[in-house]
């Protein structure tokens, strides 16, 4: 069998059309959703991400502001900028592009953003609300994974979901979202002893470890749904954490890289910004 490919690009385009009409309705009420993005330093990957976020905002009519600060910026200067944006009524969402230079504490920055403008869903208050299943801004990549599964009519309730990876940005929250949808969830990570034994039990396998082609067909149960969140560059080409060619022969559904989860991440950021503007 060959897996059904979950096309994140096509789904993102469809969702963005829906979001565009929501923006139009908000504008009719005199509200233009506004997103502020702060970029500290000039990390090439971060610069690319920030540009694509701005372009996506433009396409659907969200007002976006990019604040570029030098790599030498102090933590105090960055926190002052966040305070200013917290108090700016034209800005509904604030995003600080990670990673930050070493003199700045990421946690201090995340906690300084007003929870009402935390469109990345990283503030401890947002995370806590997600844990107890309350309405909140969900982290964009896990939110994108959830929407992809729902749109593909993949049943989550009662299924065994195995998450490989435990980062605060993807691994931990995506497992929590699956638990909120009534799945049984197992986390694996670098200290997990019997990885293959556990991943082979997964009905839904979500991989986010940042290691190229780390998961191959030997890790996957026949008919499992495999979501590849990784993005790695090997010999100048992008690839995921899953060995696409071998896994597509055993999985029932599989996300490609590029064109899988990636386009959904920015789409959910747009959705969160619109939600913030409504509130």
From Swiss-Prot:
Keyword Lipid metabolism attributed: no
Cell wall biogenesis/degradation among keywords: no
Catalysis: reaction(s): (6R)-5,10-methylene-5,6,7,8-tetrahydrofolate + NADP(+) = (6R)-5,10-methenyltetrahydrofolate + NADPH; (6R)-5,10-methenyltetrahydrofolate + H2O = (6R)-10-formyltetrahydrofolate + H(+)
UniProt-listed Enzyme Commission number(s): 1.5.1.5, 3.5.4.9
Binding site for NADP(+): 165-167, 190, 231
Coiled-coil ranges from the UniProt annotation: none
GO annotation, biological process: L-histidine biosynthetic process; methionine biosynthetic process; purine nucleotide biosynthetic process; tetrahydrofolate interconversion
Keyword annotations: Amino-acid biosynthesis, Histidine biosynthesis, Hydrolase, Methionine biosynthesis, Multifunctional enzyme, NADP, One-carbon metabolism, Oxidoreductase, Purine biosynthesis
Pathway the protein takes part in: One-carbon metabolism; tetrahydrofolate interconversion
One GO cellular component, as annotated: cytosol
Subunit structure: Homodimer.
Homology family: Belongs to the tetrahydrofolate dehydrogenase/cyclohydrolase family.
Annotated function: Catalyzes the oxidation of 5,10-methylenetetrahydrofolate to 5,10-methenyltetrahydrofolate and then the hydrolysis of 5,10-methenyltetrahydrofolate to 10-formyltetrahydrofolate.
Name of the protein: Bifunctional protein FolD
Native organism: Halalkalibacterium halodurans (strain ATCC BAA-125 / DSM 18197 / FERM 7344 / JCM 9153 / C-125)
Organism lineage string: Bacteria, Bacillati, Bacillota, Bacilli, Bacillales
